[in-house]
């Protein structure tokens, strides 16, 4: 056989290593979430008088989670540079970013209110927030559904039975 990756019969092992790398470092850049959090903060500041105090907590949570995600990716990258590998913990990151993406876009739509659905006001880039919100539903599905990731976490990280 030509162009064989790994040994004979190791295809699943190679596929899982590739998927772990994809989930752990490649699929979603931390900068993407940091930029979205910054835009969300600006959206909040532009509409602060229309927002409830609870909305401020959502903005702080989005910012803190985007920074947490960046730190976890930096940790994973430094682990790899030191000769380590991406393990099953990449499943934690995949669930984290997919839920963070949805939460940030959902928060933006709450700030914009019903008018976001009725007009494409360029001042607030409502159309971009709506598009991002709709796309955020794909995150928990692609790169292995979040349900599958939870099973991986339970079995491989927590040692729970299948």
Label each residue range with its predicted role.
Residues 45, 49-56, 67-123:
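C-terminal helix-coil-helix/basic helical segment that borders enzyme active sites and/or dimer interfaces
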Residues 41, 106, 151-152:
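Short glycine-/small-residue-rich flexible loop motifs, especially phosphate/cofactor-binding loops
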Residues 1-69, 139, 155:
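Glycine-rich beta->alpha junctions and the first turn(s) of the following alpha-helix
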Residues 9-30, 112-162:
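Glycine-rich phosphate/cofactor-binding loops in nucleotide/flavin-utilizing enzymes
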Residues 19, 35-42, 82, 86, ...:
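Short amphipathic alpha-helical patches
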Residues 7, 51, 61, 65, ...:
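Secondary-structure capping and boundary motifs in well-ordered enzyme cores
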Residues 13-21, 37, 71-75, 79-86, ...:
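Short acidic (Asp/Glu) and glycine-rich catalytic loops that position anionic groups and cofactors
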